[in-house]
Amino acid sequence: MSCLPALDKFLQNYHQAYLTTLGELPRYYPQGEPSVCIQGEFFADSDKPIAWQPVKRDEVGSFTNVEHALDLPLWPDIHLFYGQYFSAPLLFDSKWGTGELLQVWNDDDFKCLQQNVIGHLMMKKKLKQPPTWFIGLLDEGDKMLTINNSDGSVWIEIPGEEQSEQLSTSLTAFIEALSPRIAPPVKHEELPMPALDHPGIFANIKRMWQNLFGKG
């Protein structure tokens, strides 16, 4: 089953929750990065958060190049989860704790995502572990949320280790179990490592990539 209907509904509920509770759109620190998601004026040198809303992409993003580069078919949800929208990360509450779903802010962010998916999968191969790909973070970034590439199930994964706890049999069921979390925007630190120099999606997975790329 495609995860897109569940993602569509969560995005709708997410923005409605902010409008109902705060009377405004959610806010995000773009850190100088433009995006069609931005509502209102945008100044690249501003350090203030902006209002945003998700925008469906004119051309759906694809990970076919990643599949070809690694000679590895990816579970189809990856194209739908990351390729349909431009969006800021989505905060959530759940029975497993609080966390966020990663999304793509602009085209450059998507290219960085592809590169880092390759890096993650190469690390899994180096560690002789089954392939996975990440969708978000749990418990303030201490745990990764990853997809088992063989069956599409959702798991908790500690960087450098194998998946440890299954949360859901599918990405659809996982997203359907989440509730939007209303919270003020958080300004993420820029990372010094070359693989992490993009201030969009990867500033949100600092702990993960410090662990993975620090192994060399």
UniProtKB/Swiss-Prot annotation:
NCBIfam families: PRK04968.1. The keyword Oxidoreductase does not apply. The gene is syd. It is a peripheral membrane protein. It is found in: Cell inner membrane. The keyword GTP-binding does not apply. GO terms for cellular component: cytoplasmic side of plasma membrane. Belongs to the Syd family. It holds the Pfam family Syd. It comes from the Bacteria. Coiled coil: none annotated. It comes from Shewanella sp. (strain W3-18-1). HAMAP family: Syd. Keywords: Cell inner membrane, Cell membrane, Membrane. This is Protein Syd. Interacts with the SecY protein in vivo. May bind preferentially to an uncomplexed state of SecY, thus functioning either as a chelating agent for excess SecY in the cell or as a regulatory factor that negatively controls the translocase function. The lineage of its organism: Bacteria, Pseudomonadati, Pseudomonadota, Gammaproteobacteria, Alteromonadales.
